[in-house]
Amino acid sequence: SLLKRDYLLHSSGLIISGQASPALDLLLNQLPSTPGNLPVLQSHMNTYNGLYSLYFEKVHIACAAAAPEDVRSLVPGLSLTALLFCQYPMGFYVKKGNPRNIHDFPDLTRADIIFANREKGSSRRVLLDRTLKSSGISPESISGYRNELVSDYSTAAAVAGGQADVALGDSYAVRSFPELTFLPLTQETLYLIMHSENLDTPGFQAVTETISSENFRRTLALQTGYDTTHTGEIFSI
């Protein structure tokens, strides 16, 4: 609740925004074991909503897959620090063997293809819309563009269940659907964005120390296949 959020904003605990993510799940599971049993609350929201909430001081940390220049425009006038969380491939979910022969974004406009889309504000939707605009592709030419789902698992399930032919997401979700194939297209970087003035407080130190630890990086890579080469790197935005 908002009351709970406001309470935590003035406590030693942390509110971290973010959607379902194996990386965030691992972090949240490890933080309570840090000294002091740091209380942590996850606020489930997508990248853009999380950054807006950081701007309006409703969360302490935004887990966001957004380029630094996007963060600066969404959270203007503030001194922010980004902690690189992990990197992972983004691509299409299709049926095993790719029977529809889908390979790139222009294929989404074909009359025989139904797309399972994500909601506005999610990094998947941002990637899609930017690519469509730069390629001169009208969203209205894509069957299913207006049908929004709210997670990689839900879009992958739509493809697996035959409600759609293709969806856009990261590689991890496909592990739960043996009937699907993942077609990599690009790489996405996930960050933890926070106010720079909070970096030296115990809660934020616990986050940075946990993510930077060799144990966390190794476990995350083994469990997800994500690239943790630069995990724990910190820079100002």
Predicted regions located by residue number:
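Periplasmic-binding protein-like
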Residues: 84-91, 180-209, 228-235
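Hydrophobic/proline-rich hinge and linker segments of small-molecule sensing/allosteric domains
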Residues: 81-117, 190-196
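N-terminal hydrophobic or amphipathic helices and topogenic motifs
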Residues: 1-60, 66, 73-80, 100-106, ...
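General small-molecule cofactor/ligand-binding pocket signal
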Residues: 40-45, 145-146, 183
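Ligand-binding cleft/hinge of the Venus flytrap
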Residues: 26-37, 106, 118-120, 124-147
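A ligand-binding cleft/hinge motif common to bilobed small-molecule-binding domains
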Residues: 63-75, 156-186
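Short helices/loops that flank or line small-molecule/ion binding pockets
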Residues: 48-62, 148-164
